[in-house]
Structure formats: C-alpha cells, structure tokens
Amino acid sequence: MNNSLSLFVKEMRKRFGFTQVDLAAKAGVGLRFVRELEQGKQTLRIDKVNQVLALFGYEVGAVPAGKEHSV
C-alpha cells in the first residue's frame, strides 16, 4: 500500500483519539489488520481498508497517478 495511506490512517486514528485496538473494534477488522495497514503492508484487502476509512468519512478510489504514469 502507498505509504501516504498508512500515514493518513495513523494520523486520523490519533486525531480521533483511538488506539489501534479501538480502531480495529470500531471498524470491525482485526488488530493485526490495523497494524499492517499503518505499517504500509503492500497487499491488503480493499474492502477492509474501506471499512477503516469509512470511520473517517473516506474510501479508496481511483485518482490520477501523475504524468509519468499516463498512457
């Protein structure tokens, strides 16, 4: 996963005053998943990522990658 996503989730979790345990419980995912998400694991289930992001009013979506990635 993109490191900026990991940092975003960690920052939002702290802003909301959640521990990793709190976030896992509120999002309905495992603690291990939250840890892996915040550590930038490269392969994560998008549905679970969206469960976490939904707590903060966000979801994973397609965005422009930048000029170097254009067809």
Report the location of each language-model feature:
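A detector for short, charged/polar N-terminal pre-domain segments
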Residues: M1-S4
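Short basic helix-loop element that most often maps to the first helix and adjoining turn
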Residues: L7-D22, K26, Q51
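Recognition helix of helix-turn-helix/homeodomain-like DNA-binding domains
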Residues: G28-Q42
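DNA major-groove recognition helix of helix-turn-helix/homeodomain DNA-binding modules
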Residues: D47-V63
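Helix-turn-helix/homeodomain-like alpha-helical modules used for DNA recognition
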Residues: K67-V71
